[in-house]
């Protein structure tokens, strides 16, 4: 039997600009019955390793945020230690390539942002 999975792929905690601690956010996601969640704090690896907490999968992630735009990295530790300036699109590309090599899935946030110079090619 096929099943739909409920989850959220873009969550922030008090480690960046969210209003809940990681523990509280995990608890709230479990309360509403999510199957998975990805904490994507800005430029910070809040979840050090993906894991199950009861029946809910907590996936490691991070939102790379700087002048050129915002990119989510899911499922692998971002290979840099903040603070790390990402001043150019080339800086992002290098970090994204390194993240992919580490096994991450990449998601471009806000693709129609007028001041984010990513090219959708």
Task: State what each model feature region is.
Residues 1-121:
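A metal-dependent hydrolase metal-coordination microenvironment
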């Amino acid at each position: 039997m096929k099943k739909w999975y409920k989850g959220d792929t873009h969550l922030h905690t008090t480690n960046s600009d969210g209003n809940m601690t990681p523990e509280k956010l995990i608890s709230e996601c479990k309360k509403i019955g999510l199957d998975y969640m990805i904490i994507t704090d800005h430029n910070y690896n809040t979840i050090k390793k993906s894991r199950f907490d009861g029946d809910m999968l907590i996936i490691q992630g991070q939102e790379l945020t700087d002048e050129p735009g915002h990119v989510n990295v899911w499922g692998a530790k971002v290979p840099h230690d903040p603070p790390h300036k990402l001043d150019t699109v080339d800086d992002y590309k290098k970090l994204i390539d390194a993240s992919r090599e580490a096994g991450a899935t990449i998601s471009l946030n806000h693709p129609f942002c007028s001041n984010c110079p990513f090219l959708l090619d």
